[in-house]
Amino acid sequence: MRLSYILVVVIAVTLQACVCATPVIKEANQAMLANGPLPSIVNTEGGRLLRGVKKRTAEREVQEERMSGAKLSEKGKQFLKWFFRGSDTRVKGRSWR
C-alpha cells in the first residue's frame, strides 16, 4: 500500500513540474511576430557563424595528447616493474614505498 502512495505522489509531482515548465506560448509568439527576429541572430553578412580554429593551437593539443600517453605508459611500466619485482624504482625522486 505504501508503494502505491509513493507512485501516486511521484507521478503527481512529475506532472505538476511538467505543467509549470511549459511557457505560455501565445504571448511569446505574438511578441516575436510583432518585433521580428533579433539582428544578432540573423546573419546579415552571409558568412559562416562558426568559430575559427587556429592551426597551431590544434597541433599543439594533439602533441600534448601524444606526450601524455607516452608519459602514462612510461609510468605504468615503472609501476609494474616495482609491483612484480619489488625493486625501488624512483619516480621524480620518490620511491613507490
From Swiss-Prot:
InterPro entries: RXLR (IPR031825). Coiled coil: none annotated. Belongs to the RxLR effector family. The RxLR-dEER motif acts to carry the protein into the host cell cytoplasm through binding to cell surface phosphatidylinositol-3-phosphate. Disulfide bonds: none annotated. The gene is PexRD21. It comes from the Eukaryota. Keywords: Host cell membrane, Host membrane, Membrane, Secreted, Signal, Virulence. Transmembrane segments: none annotated. This is RxLR effector protein PexRD21. GO terms for cellular component: extracellular region; host cell plasma membrane; membrane. Induction: Expression is induced during host plant infection. Effector that is involved in host plant infection. Contributes to virulence during the early infection stage, by inhibiting plant defense responses induced by both PAMP-triggered immunity (PTI) and effector-triggered immunity (ETI). Residues 1-21 form the signal peptide. The keyword Secreted applies. Its main location: secreted. It is found in: Secreted; Host cell membrane. A motif (RxLR-dEER) lies at residues 48-66.
